[in-house]
């Protein structure tokens, strides 16, 4: 299903963010959030989805039934709600969303899109038994609809950087306070790699709430090897193979996942061998994803390798640029599409020392996309040679004309919705 029939997405800026609305809605629906399996609650700016995917892969491989709630989605809404390891069916999705619609109208509640879909997900999770629920925040943490869950089993805070400043604050400590809102008294929290001022904010919050924290660089860490990485903590040291998800940042995500499992492993008893295999089997599309040339042979020759990455903020751009610098040698073409709340020049500045040709495109599946002309003009301010194309498909065609049959790489980035546009071309 592309989108549920209810609630209807809105792009209003006056949405009230608090937990009162979701609490009223869940009461009207019978408080399904009180009957969920043990919850792993995840907040952060980057790495939430990758960490969720790794956890899902590991727990599934270990034989556990896994519920998972993530956002946004690539192609269809069902991706967001995984019930006992399977994407929710169209029929079940319609049923739980209809329950939300009926309750909303009966009790005069106007849920936001995320509040309504979160309530629908909880209804689906309540109906089917599972051993664990991986629950990802939508925005922030403290006032996020998922934070209605008062007693998770454990929490994870992935790397925090600048994003959604209009909602979360314009400094890293302010953003960190919002993300730290998922911390609960006496519930362990794994803290992934952060800059110092974020660490200090999270440590202070953990101390205030009496949260047992387990922190990257302080309580556990990694050392990269030729075949993977060595994870070490006060509890154990073990060499794990390279994860299926590419990039050094994914080693840090993997380390945080391993740390999390180690803290709850008395309850689940997952071996390091299963963790290793789970990391190797993780699938999470559009994260430095190498697309098989046969899938896009109608678009361009197989001498050109297409990569997809959903980097959309400065920290994501930095990670992607570092990976390109370390791994790609042939000519590089960057196809960029971004939403209107993104700073194009800042994003592109991370790629300015690379020999790169940029193409700005409008994101067709994003109503609030920057125009191709704006991306072209703003991208040029960073020092990159930018052009504009009428569409993603035309950008690939333009590259084909310039590049011919020579070896090259195309990086499609800037928006998850642009990645979605690409998959629809295949």
Where would I find each of the regions flagged by the language model?
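C-terminal helical cap/extension that packs against the catalytic core
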Residues: 195-205, 210, 225, 302-308, ...
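A conserved segment at the C-terminal end of the G1
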Residues: 38, 42, 50-67
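Extended acidic/charged loop-beta regions that coordinate divalent cations
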Residues: 72, 117-167, 199-239
């Amino acid at each position: 299903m592309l989108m549920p029939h209810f609630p209807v997405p809105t792009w209003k800026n006056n949405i009230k963010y608090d937990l009162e609305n979701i609490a009223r809605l869940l009461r009207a629906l019978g408080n399904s959030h009180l009957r969920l399996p043990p919850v792993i609650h995840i907040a952060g700016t980057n790495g939430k989805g990758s960490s969720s995917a790794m956890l899902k892969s590991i727990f599934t491989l270990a034989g556990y039934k896994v519920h998972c709630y993530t956002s946004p989605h690539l192609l269809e809404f069902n991706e967001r709600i995984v019930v006992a390891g399977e994407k929710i069916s169209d029929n079940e999705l319609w049923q739980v969303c209809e329950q939300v619609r009926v309750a909303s109208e009966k009790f005069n509640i106007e849920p936001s899109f995320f509040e309504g879909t979160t309530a629908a997900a909880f209804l689906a999770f309540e109906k089917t038994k599972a051993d664990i629920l991986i629950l990802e925040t939508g925005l922030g943490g403290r006032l996020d609809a998922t934070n209605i869950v008062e007693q998770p089993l454990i929490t994870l805070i992935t790397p925090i950087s600048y994003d959604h400043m209009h909602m979360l604050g314009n400094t890293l400590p302010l953003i960190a306070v919002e993300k730290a809102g998922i911390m609960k008294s006496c519930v362990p929290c794994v803290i992934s790699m952060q800059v110092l001022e974020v660490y200090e904010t999270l440590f202070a919050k953990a101390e205030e709430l009496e949260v047992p924290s387990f922190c990257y660089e302080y309580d556990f860490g990694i050392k990269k090897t030729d075949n993977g990485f060595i994870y070490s903590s006060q509890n154990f040291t073990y060499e794990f193979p390279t994860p299926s998800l590419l990039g050094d940042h994914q080693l840090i995500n993997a380390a945080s996942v391993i740390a999390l499992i180690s803290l709850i492993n008395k309850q689940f008893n997952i071996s390091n061998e299963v963790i290793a295999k789970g990391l190797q089997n993780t699938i999470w599309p559009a994260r430095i994803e190498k697309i098989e040339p046969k899938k896009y042979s109608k678009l361009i020759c197989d001498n050109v390798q297409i990569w997809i990455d959903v980097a959309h903020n400065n920290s994501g751009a930095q990670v992607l640029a570092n990976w390109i610098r370390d791994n790609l040698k042939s000519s590089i073409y960057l196809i960029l599409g971004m939403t209107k709340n993104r700073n194009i020049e800042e994003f592109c500045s991370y790629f300015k020392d690379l020999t790169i040709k940029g193409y700005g495109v409008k994101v067709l599946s994003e109503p609030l996309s920057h125009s191709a002309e704006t991306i072209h003009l703003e991208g040029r301010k960073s020092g990159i040679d930018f052009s504009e194309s009428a569409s993603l498909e035309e950008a690939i065609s333009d590259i084909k004309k310039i590049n011919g049959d020579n070896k090259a790489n195309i990086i499609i980035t800037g928006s998850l919705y642009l990645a979605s546009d690409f998959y629809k071309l295949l």
